Regions:
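GH16 jelly-roll
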Residues: 1-119
């Protein structure tokens, strides 16, 4: 899940990315911030539930229980998503190796909770 300026439009990207022998593959769903603000004008000032359901067949990304992207992992060469992984929560600032604008700092990245379920 990423926040990007896509042209002049602030957007949320729900991405899956994998590599096969150096060939990078993406499944991206781009939703403008206006899409969410049209549902709730105060949307960007609230906490939201981001969810990843990862089964033997699919990976699905949800925002506030709305499905925003999914892939069938059985269709991916090498079964990259059938290995063990770890969770990484970070605030990546900058883009393509560029230094972030110091005038935008400091920033706050608040996470209320993390839940992990495993079958």
């Amino acid at each position: 899940m990423e926040y990007y300026m896509c042209g002049d439009s602030p957007s949320i990207l729900a991405n899956f990315m994998w590599s096969n022998n150096g060939e990078y593959n993406w499944s991206t769903k781009q939703l403008s911030l206006d899409y969410f603000k049209n549902k709730d004008n105060n949307w960007e000032n609230k906490f939201h539930i981001w969810k990843l359901d990862w089964t033997k067949e699919y990976m699905r990304i949800y925002i506030d229980d709305e499905l925003v992207n999914e892939i069938n992992i059985n269709n991916i060469k090498g079964n990259k998503f059938k290995k063990k992984y770890y969770i990484l929560l970070n605030l990546a600032i900058g883009r393509k190796g560029l230094r972030p604008n110091d005038n935008a700092l400091p920033l706050v990245y608040e996470i209320e909770y993390v839940k992990v379920y495993q079958n």
